């Protein structure tokens, strides 16, 4: 009887949406243009920006998953010192090139050290990607010679795509 109960519990847990399939993905984000709003300096000589909007292209792929589209982002908190070290918190909307009613919305938290950027990003799918989530890291591609780059920044993306887990929070998604 103990074996039967153990087997049934195992099947129940393995079939549970709480253990969603996680597909490793990788790709690229290329910043094409930016609009900078007003900025100001604090007493520590760090620059704060009221608004930065960036536009770019994104491509992500993995086994049985692919996404290519346009990126629109708004940086809600940007603080940089004279050495280009600081923090950025941003919101993103990635719009599918196949269907503009589908894509991913999300946010990121980035740390910048001497101009080199590392971010953690979270996204929720909409349209044909409804019910999917992306959890990614963004790393600035080291091979780019910043002195000779004209017009764009290139970032490497790595992470997971999965089904959104069931909400355990009352009133949560």
Segments predicted by a language model, with ranges:
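Positively charged n-region of N-terminal signal peptides that target proteins for export
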Residues: 1-4
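Intrinsic disorder/low-complexity segments, especially N-terminal tails and targeting/processing regions
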Residues: 6-7, 25
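Sec/Tat signal peptide C-region and signal peptidase I cleavage site
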Residues: 16-20
């Amino acid at each position: 009887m103990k074996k039967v109960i153990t087997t049934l519990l195992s099947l129940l847990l393995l079939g549970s949406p709480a253990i969603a399939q996680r597909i490793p993905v990788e790709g690229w984000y290329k910043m094409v243009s930016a609009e900078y709003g007003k900025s100001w300096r604090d007493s520590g000589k760090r620059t704060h920006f009221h608004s930065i909007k960036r536009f770019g292209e994104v491509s992500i792929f993995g086994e049985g998953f692919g996404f290519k589209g346009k990126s629109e982002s708004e940086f809600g908190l940007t603080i940089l010192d004279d050495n280009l070290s600081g923090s950025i918190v941003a919101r993103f909307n990635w719009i599918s090139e196949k269907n503009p009613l589908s894509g991913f919305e999300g946010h990121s938290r980035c740390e910048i050290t001497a101009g080199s950027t590392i971010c953690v990003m979270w996204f929720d799918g909409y349209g044909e990607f409804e019910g999917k989530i992306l959890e990614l890291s963004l790393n600035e591609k080291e091979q780019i010679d910043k002195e000779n780059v004209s017009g764009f920044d290139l970032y490497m993306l790595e992470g997971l795509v999965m089904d959104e887990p069931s909400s355990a929070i009352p009133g949560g998604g």
